[in-house]
A protein has these predicted regions:
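Catalytic cores of nucleotide-sugar-dependent glycosyltransferases that transfer UDP/GDP/TDP-activated
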Residues: 1-271
Length: 271
């Protein structure tokens, strides 16, 4: 039986401008699907996405849940579209406060949003709640981009008893792109949810910046990939020190190396 891979991407072209992250957000799921694996793909519904041009539409049966972050209700809206020239369907996580009326991770003046940490938390919980509703059980969950970095932590704590994710292995791709600002003093308390308890956050700095977020992702991942050159050496060293399986940058022709890494993390069993 073909492996099932859930891709949780920060960016995917053509919905947002071409960057290393958005290109990888398209190319990796496409190559994995072409290799015969079953996939699902998620990204935030950034405010700069043209819904009409991208032919996004809301999925009513998946929308409407309220996610509470810092004692405030935020409504989860799910939209979906298909990437032209491919059979890839993309699910978008949307919310009026966090995404619809914003740009991406920075505003129109280039300033990073102060609540980017909360946005990452909402995105993580939104994805996981939606996958549960889809009744689709992934074997591998591959997180690309720091906006998805909370997901490994939640999978191994708050969602560890969920049948949907019980047997899944988590892979985190580290990129050189990183925010300059930290995620605010409240991040460590905001991320607490169900079994994702505050005691698990005690070992991380109160000034929760990109490196701390990266360490959090690594600590709860089953494998880590160096997705391009220039990844923070502190994070690669952290993965090595924690003895988390690490795939060093395999070059631009990456698919064979990624497929072998998937097999290492989640070996195929004979039916």
């Amino acid at each position: 039986m073909a492996k099932k891979v859930l891709f949780i991407n920060q960016e995917i072209t053509p919905y947002v401008p071409e960057t290393l992250l958005s290109t990888m957000g398209l190319n990796l799921p496409q190559k994995v699907q072409e290799a015969g694996l079953e996939i699902r793909t998620f990204m935030p519904k950034w405010g700069n996405i043209n819904e009409r041009r991208g032919q996004l539409h809301e999925v009513i049966r998946l929308s409407g849940m309220n996610l509470i972050i810092d004692d405030t209700d935020h409504t989860l809206i799910i939209k979906v579209a298909s990437i032209p020239q491919s059979r890839i369907q993309v699910y978008f996580i949307d919310n009026d406060d966090y995404f619809t009326h914003r740009q991406m991770t920075v505003d129109e003046h280039g300033a990073e949003y102060e609540d980017n940490g909360e946005r990452a938390i909402f995105f993580a919980r939104g994805v996981l709640e939606t996958v549960k509703k889809l009744r689709w059980t992934p074997d591998i969950i591959h997180c690309q981009g720091w906006m998805s970095a909370v997901i490994p932590f939640y999978l191994k704590t708050a969602y560890r008893e969920e049948p949907t994710f019980a047997h899944a292995k988590v892979v985190t791709s580290l990129f050189s792109e990183q925010p300059k600002s930290d995620f605010g003093k409240k991040f460590k308390s905001s991320v607490v949810y169900k079994e994702a308890k505050s005691k698990f956050m005690k070992g991380y700095n109160d000034k929760f910046d990109y490196l701390e977020l990266g360490k959090l992702a690594i600590d709860y991942s089953d494998g880590v990939i160096e997705a391009n050159r220039g990844v923070a050496p502190e994070l690669l060293a952290h993965a090595s020190n924690k003895k988390v399986p690490l795939l060093n940058f395999p070059g631009d022709d990456f698919m064979d190396a990624y497929a072998a890494f998937y097999e290492k993390i989640y070996p195929t069993t004979e039916e």
